[in-house]
Amino acid sequence: MAGVHYGDLHAKAENQVFLYWDSGSYRAIPVSGNAPILPAGSDDAFVEHICVNPAGARLEGYPKGSVRAELSAAAVAGKIRPFFSEEQTPTLYAALEGDLSRLTPASLLAAAETDTALQPVADETIKQFCVMLHTLYCLYFAEHINLYGFGFTPEHLEQIRKAAAEFAGKDFAQAIILCPIGERYHFLSGCTYLIQTGFYQRGGLCS
């Protein structure tokens, strides 16, 4: 009986979106309280179909200027590749050991602080990133957008928030946070979900 009222007693009554970085692409899980808004088995890669630049790149199966075509690791790497070198982008080149396939949003922002050639790409990426976040923010009436798995530092967060505030105001900017859930909770979160859903809500094992 300890968990009968788990949802009422422990879940915060707010909508949130968990946006996470997964091997070079984006995934999103909208949540209301402590429960996912979308049904189990829904495609969490829907976020990659969001348009962040109507005049942007085309990719088969996606709208013009989609997240996939503009913000994926492969897409951003394509913008950097023409000048990626030990001479022009020394910080990024060293961080990635000369391998652009290892690019992440965090490594781009960190390197752009010293590699001046990267700054236009970094600025454009942040702006388009904020368009994606704002779409999710409005679509799900989210009180928070949690960024998970990106490797962002608090300084990176402030950089993103500054661009977000210029784009859509301070309230939106402050809704963007670094997800407090650490990697050690991956297994525990799964156990919690199974116990809550399978036993407390359904009265037995999940089918």
Each predicted region: which residue ranges?
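ATP-binding/phosphotransfer module of carbohydrate and carboxylate kinases, centering on a glycine-rich
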Residues: 7-11, 67-207
